[in-house]
Amino acid sequence: MRIKIKDILISSKDVKFVGNIKNIERVVSFYSLDSREIKDDNINDSLYFAYKGNKVDGFSFVKYLIDLGVKCFACSREHESECIKYLNDNEGLVFLLTSNVIKLLQALASFLIEKTSFKRIAITGSNGKTTTKEMLYSILSKKYKTYKTWGNLNSDIGLPLSILRVEGNEEYAVFEVGVSYVGEMDLLSQILKPEIVIITNISYAHMQAFKELQAIAFEKSKIIGKNIEIFVVNEMNDYCVYLEKRAKIANPNVKIVYFDFENLSIKSFSFLDGKFSFDFVYKGFEYSILLLGRHNIFNAIGCINLALFLGMREKEIKEGLIETAFQKGRAEILTKNGYLILNDSYNGNMGSFMALKNMILDLNIQNKKFIVLGSFKELGELAYKTHKDLIQEAISMNFDKIFLIGEEFLDVRDSENLVEKCLYYFSEFDKFIDFFLKSLEPSVFIVIKGSRFNRLERILNIFR
């Protein structure tokens, strides 16, 4: 969205303008915390947030960006003297000084969202957020001008950045919302103020922070605020009734839309030359998704019911589903150098692993099967049990070789004496990859699964 510097000053009480007063009328429309995102086509319109992270201090790139041609910066007050020095050499610069760069980003997003007229849709849940977002965006785009969160900008930093990147003239905006610590959803809900909320499911994820499922359900439910008009909920989830009550407390007139599976019939699954299609009939109309996994049909039904409620026709919905562009690393089927590869390396929790198990059963692979499992993170006290369960589930799936990467798996091996001949343990990726290369056999089916932390997509490099 386009905004004048003078309006940014209104968005927060904790911001100080440093620059020539005439530049207060300057307009910005591209917002970034990553200097690499600033290119020739957005230099003149950029506002760079010089955020100090755990590894990199964004202020260290300010001089480089000034030389590149960027004019506007949000910086910590501790850098005021340096900013003034830069300003003495270039009076066209604007510095917005604040005690907390990220809080300024969040305040600006909250301020600007109030200026928009589009319907704000929030999608959250333990699994399926990104896939559901992509499907709903593709469907709505068949009839309405629609925006979506790009990538997985869904956190206390990513969501406000995603909000700032809308054009402002959309009819619907679909935002993915994720949490990794207690209280994060309070903040995200206050920033976004969604009118339509979809909760895909409640299952084990981020257990280090939340300890138990009830705590996850409570945290996720905080996305439901007083602005809610429509609530879409999976009626198969154990917390459906609880979430529905929360929605009705927030707004007694809220419209409830269910993931209703009574009228669902899975017609066929086809897999040919690395391409697949799930065909199903729902409420008498035939749909298809080009994505592996029956659980994705369930998420598609949530999107279908919401789209129908919003006045879309079945034909439009069908076209939107079939045209959905899905992200890499999420149930992605690849054929490389004669190998069939199922790459599900982006997300690691027990719920997504069980969904993966069903995908593999649907594929009905007759060739030899290898699986590479990277350890799952943020499990807290459940880490040991989860990794033990993972090993046992993998064994039950009759893989010919199971490659396990991470100290968590080694702990289970040593305590449980799990040393079956199909199991191969490695403390880290670098110790695994050479052994894996030597283990490959022609035409083997390879499954890759792990947390984003593991960066298991690096395996794909050996097939190029």
Curated annotation (Swiss-Prot):
Subcellular localization: Cytoplasm
Coiled-coil intervals: none
Pfam families reported for this sequence: Mur_ligase, Mur_ligase_C, Mur_ligase_M
Biological pathway: Cell wall biogenesis; peptidoglycan biosynthesis
Keywords from the UniProt entry: ATP-binding, Cell cycle, Cell division, Cell shape, Cell wall biogenesis/degradation, Cytoplasm, Ligase, Nucleotide-binding, Peptidoglycan synthesis
InterPro entries xrefs: Mur-like_cat_sf, Mur_ligase_C, Mur_ligase_C_dom_sf, Mur_ligase_cen, Mur_ligase_N, MurCDEF_CellWall_CoF430Synth, MurE/MurF_N, UDP-N-AcMur_synth
GO BP: any one term: cell wall organization
Chain residues that bind ATP: G125, S126, N127, G128, K129, T130, T131
EC id: 6.3.2.10
Name by which UniProt lists this protein: UDP-N-acetylmuramoyl-tripeptide--D-alanyl-D-alanine ligase
Organism: Borreliella burgdorferi (strain ATCC 35210 / DSM 4680 / CIP 102532 / B31) (Borrelia burgdorferi)
Upper lineage: Bacteria, Pseudomonadati, Spirochaetota, Spirochaetia, Spirochaetales
